[in-house]
Each structure stands twice: as C-alpha cells, then as structure tokens.
Swiss-Prot record:
Name of the coding gene: lplA
Molecular function terms from GO: ATP binding; lipoate-protein ligase activity; lipoyltransferase activity
Gene Ontology terms: cellular component: cytosol
Species annotation: Shigella dysenteriae serotype 1 (strain Sd197)
Binding site for (R)-lipoate: 134
Highest taxon of source: Bacteria
InterPro entries to which the protein is assigned, alphabetical: aa-tRNA-synth_II/BPL/LPL, BPL_LPL_catalytic, Lipoate_ligase_A, Lipoate_protein_ligase_C, LipoylTrfase_LipoateP_Ligase
Protein name: Lipoate-protein ligase A
Misc. comment: In the transfer reaction, the free carboxyl group of lipoic acid is attached via an amide linkage to the epsilon-amino group of a specific lysine residue of lipoyl domains of lipoate-dependent enzymes.
Length: 338
C-alpha cells in the first residue's frame, strides 16, 4: 500500500477547504505523506493569532462579498482569489520536514521554467530587474507527532485588490496580535504568460511523486457530497463561524470617534475573544445620559455591529426624546464596526 495520498478540492469555499485540511491533518496515519491542492474565491485568510479588525478592511470586505477565514497555522494575512493556487503538505514525524516540501514546490516551478529560491522564513522569490519578487508565501503547523506546510502560489492574482482588503481603515486601533509584513509580489503569469492552475497542480503533483518514488490516484473533494472525513460537519461549522474567524482575535482596544450636529462622541472599547470587556464614552453633548447608558450596556456584548445597534436601539424606550440622536448613533455604528 502506498504511503502517499493526493487530494484535490473542486470547491472555492475557504471554510470548506480549511475544514478539509484540518480533518485530514487530525486523522492521517503517522506514516502517511499527503498533498492537498486547492484554491479559494475572494477571501482574506488570517493567521491563527491575528486580529481581523487590525489586519483587514472588514467593511470593504463585506461590501465586496469577500470572506474572512482564520487558519490554524500562524503567520500573516493574505488575500486569495482564483488567481492563487494553494498547496498543503502533511506528514507524520520525524518524516515531516518543511525543507522537503519547499524543494518539491521549487522543483515544480523549475519544471515549468521558473527559477525561484527560498527567501527568509516562508517565501519563495524570483529575481527580476527590479529586484526579488515574492511568488509564494507559506505557513506551518506542528503537533507532537505530525506537521503541515501550506502556502500559496501567485499565478494571476488581482494584485490591485491586495491593498483594498489588507490595509485597514486609518483608525486608532492598538493591537497585541501579529501585524502582517507586506512584501513586494509578482504573478507567475509575468514570467509564464497563460500559466493555469491545472498546469501548476500537475507540476507540483509530478514533483511530489518524483521525490517519494510513488504514484497514487487523486481523490477529488467536492462540496456536492459531504467528504467522508471524521468530524467534518463539526469542523466546517467551526471554521465558518463568527466565533472562530472573529472571536478568536487576541485582546485589543478600539477607539471610534465621530462628530454629529448635537456633539462629538468617542467610544473606547476593550475587546477579548470578540466580546467587549470594557466600554467608555466621552462626549460634549448637552445630554450625555443616553450615551452613558449605552456604554453601560455593552459589558460582555459581542463586538459586532448588529449587536451594538441592538443595544443602542433598546435605549429608545428609556430615552424617547433622544430618538434622533440614538438613531444617528446606531447608523454610524453600523458602518464603523465590522
């Protein structure tokens, strides 16, 4: 029996693909070597310890229907579209070695006619007349008895959109999480016009087989049929949940400020695991009572626009004369908090 396993996803859903990856990783035999090939439609993928409110323009993402997905590995935030090819190599220890998987990807690129090299802790770069340009970034995860290396290759990604979603609004957001390092990047189509996802997958597969001296049939993973993977439904539910993607953010503080016709408002939030642990309000309004009451209601509230709006609008019962101000506050919060 072969020790290799090759899986290819035909889903573009990041939550589906990351759930598949997680399930395979948890249940694979320690003697198995796995290659999983996949890609995502418009998604910002953040590292396990990152703060989406810090890393991403979450309001722009919502408007443009871009998903947020938190992976189980560390590292920084990246934007995925169908111009990216994603790969995951898994193996039990002591077989797991990220230098092996890196060399497989480099060999695949070389077979396609691209001379690339490893740079720093997790990048692959090509040399251009303008200097080194990143074509691949990776992240890693290890447990006691196994590990995985996953990453992306930029084929024909819309690089103009990177700045749309990976540059957060210029808000006063002080975070204790990891801030992603931006790198100068380029697409493989600049070097190989017309290169396709299928060609890259085939090259990586051939390099994978060549390294281990074995071949196996590919298993196609599709959302049209629930994957036969232990605990997949539960893993997918967690991967797609707000609690995982947003609520796992490290502790941070957020300051929102706005000036209305009736006065200026500053809202200070301390947030842990997606819940407000402290809220303060500062205002020069002639009637600060409803704002003070609003801040008092927020202890333990989910840091989500709809939940804050709900608490704000609940004050209409106690402060009917301040309906205009409270509705303006609620509308502002809807746009300021995502």
């Amino acid at each position: 029996m072969s020790t290799l396993r090759l899986l290819i996803s035909d889903s573009y859903d990041p939550w589906f693909n990351l759930a598949v990856e997680e399930c395979i990783f948890r249940q694979m035999p320690a003697t198995q070597r796995v290659l999983f090939l996949w890609r995502n439609a418009d998604t910002v993928v953040i590292g396990r310890a990152q703060n989406p409110w810090k890393e991403c323009n979450t309001r722009r993402m919502e408007v443009d229907n871009v998903r947020l997905a938190r992976r189980s590995s560390g590292g920084g935030a990246v934007f995925h579209d169908l111009g990216n090819t994603c790969f995951t190599f898994m193996a039990g220890k002591p077989e797991y070695d990220k230098t092996i998987s890196t060399s497989i990807v480099l060999n695949a690129l070389n077979a396609l006619g691209v001379s690339a090299e490893a740079s720093g802790r997790n990048d692959l770069v090509v040399k251009t007349v303008e200097g080194d340009r990143k074509v691949s970034g990776s992240a890693y995860r290890e447990t006691k008895d196994r590990g995985f290396h996953h990453g992306t290759l930029l084929l024909n990604a819309d690089l103009s959109r990177l700045a749309n979603y990976l540059n957060p609004d210029k808000k006063k957001l002080a975070a204790k999480g990891i801030t992603s390092v931006r790198s100068r990047v380029t697409n493989l189509t600049e070097l190989l016009p017309g290169i396709t996802h299928e060609q890259v997958c085939e090259a990586i597969t051939k390099a994978f087989f060549a390294h281990y001296g074995e071949r196996v049939e590919a298993e196609i993973i599709s959302p049209d049929k629930t994957p036969d993977l232990p605990n997949f439904a539960e893993t997918f539910a967690r991967q797609s949940s707000w609690e995982w993607n947003f609520g796992q953010a490290p502790a941070f503080s957020h300051l929102l400020d706005e000036r209305f016709s009736w006065g200026g408002v500053e809202l200070h939030f301390d947030v842990e695991k997606g819940h407000i642990t402290r809220a303060q309000v500062f205002t020069d309004s002639l009637n600060p009572a409803p704002l003070e009451a609003f801040a008092g209601r927020l202890q333990g509230c989910l840091y989500r626009a709809d939940m804050l709006q709900q608490e704000c609008e609940a004050l209409l019962v106690d402060f009917p004369d301040q309906e205009k101000e409270l509705r303006e506050l609620s509308t502002w919060i809807a746009g300021a908090v995502r």
